[in-house]
């Protein structure tokens, strides 16, 4: 169900979020 998907997406974001943010900020400040 969508709750399982949400849980998976939440866990993925917790893991990948910080590095994605760093990449976006790094690209924006160049």
Swiss-Prot record:
Example of a GO biological process term: defense response to bacterium
Coiled-coil residue windows: none
Expression (tissue specificity): Expressed by the venom gland.
InterPro entries with a match to the protein in the record: Poneritoxin
Pfam families associated with the record: Ponericin
Subcellular location: Secreted
Location, primary (coarse class): secreted
GO cellular component labels: extracellular region
Keyword set, alphabetical order: Antibiotic, Antimicrobial, Secreted
Function, as annotated: Has activity against some Gram-positive bacteria and S.cerevisiae. Has a non-hemolytic activity.
Family to which this protein belongs: Belongs to the ponericin-G family.
Protein name: U1-poneritoxin-Ni3d
